């Protein structure tokens, strides 16, 4: 989701929708190989001070998280306009959802509810700043979030999965006038938005503004030790084992796989 830095989208801080290059080729220039052809690198690459040897493995993992999952979680919180004192719900406990917890806390959320059914992810979410865990899904999950918020619903719902169920859940738990930040890649059927007309909900989201967030907020937060998103990487694999890395994520054997180039 890198941008050119010059088009209207990039100038507005939404380089995930960059008009300066063909987004359909975003993943066709060697992004899972030893070398990458990176367009618009003069603007979109983010320089990290010093040398790799200056940093611990944990710090390098957190810096790597700035290439995708942390900015994506931050994007959900930004477009949902999470503010100080808000009650926020995060739908999804993958790496992006966990980073959305970090982002909500960074932006001052007072209460952060994560919808999660996996113990290892629940523990990490609590470490990152979540205050409540909701294991239920569907109507039961919606009812639980509403119970936790005295029937009001949340000020912001961060949808980090992209399924029909997760999207409908995010819409159902948002209070009237709330915002839904959608960063889960959509794989949904038709959703009848007329059902939510009287809710006055704001729905926003899409590919994250990685470069903008890294340069303005996230790189400094990592280097200063304020956040540690690299903890989402729970297994490492060689490039030759990339198929296994994907399989283990799909089977919930790891939260986020790290590919190490030998």
Where are these regions (language model features)?
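C-terminal hydrophobic helical "lid"/dimerization subdomain
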Residues: 168-172, 212-262
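ADP-ribose/adenylate-binding Rossmann-like module
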Residues: 172-189, 203-204
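N-terminal Rossmann-fold NAD(P) dinucleotide-binding loop
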Residues: 97-98
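A generic alpha-to-beta junction signature in SAM-dependent methyltransferases
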Residues: 80-82, 149, 161, 173-175
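NAD(P)H dinucleotide-binding glycine-rich loop of Rossmann-like/cofactor-binding domains
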Residues: 4-91
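Adenosine-nucleotide cofactor-binding segment
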Residues: 90-93, 105-169
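Residues in the short beta-alpha loop(s) of Rossmann-like NAD(P)-binding domains
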Residues: 117-118, 186, 209
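Rossmann-fold NAD(P)-binding glycine/threonine-rich loop
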Residues: 184-199, 215-219
């Amino acid at each position: 989701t890198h941008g050119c830095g010059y088009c209207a989208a990039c100038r507005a801080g939404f380089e995930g929708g960059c008009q300066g290059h063909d987004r359909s080729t975003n993943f066709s220039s060697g992004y899972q190989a030893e070398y990458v052809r990176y367009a618009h690198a003069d603007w979109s690459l983010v320089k990290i001070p010093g040398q790799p040897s200056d940093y611990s493995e944990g710090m390098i993992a957190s810096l790597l998280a700035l290439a995708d999952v942390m900015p994506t979680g931050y994007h959900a919180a930004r477009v949902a306009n999470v503010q100080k004192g808000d009650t926020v719900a995060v739908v999804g406990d993958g790496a992006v959802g966990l980073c959305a917890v970090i982002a909500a806390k960074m932006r001052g959320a007072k209460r952060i509810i994560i919808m999660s059914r996996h113990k290892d992810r629940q523990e990490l979410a609590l470490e990152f700043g979540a205050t409540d865990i909701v294991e239920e899904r569907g109507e039961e999950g919606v009812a639980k979030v509403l119970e936790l918020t005295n029937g009001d619903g949340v000020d912001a719902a961060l949808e980090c999965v992209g399924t029909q169920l997760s999207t409908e859940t995010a819409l159902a738990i948002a209070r009237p006038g709330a915002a839904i930040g959608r960063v889960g890649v959509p794989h949904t059927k038709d959703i009848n938005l007329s059902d939510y007309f009287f809710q006055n909900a704001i729905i926003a989201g899409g590919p994250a503004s990685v470069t903008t967030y890294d340069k303005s907020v996230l790189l400094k937060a990592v280097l200063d030790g304020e956040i540690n998103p690299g903890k989402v990487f729970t297994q490492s694999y060689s490039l030759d084992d990339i198929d296994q890395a994907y399989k283990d994520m799909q089977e919930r054997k790891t939260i986020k796989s790290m590919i190490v180039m030998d």
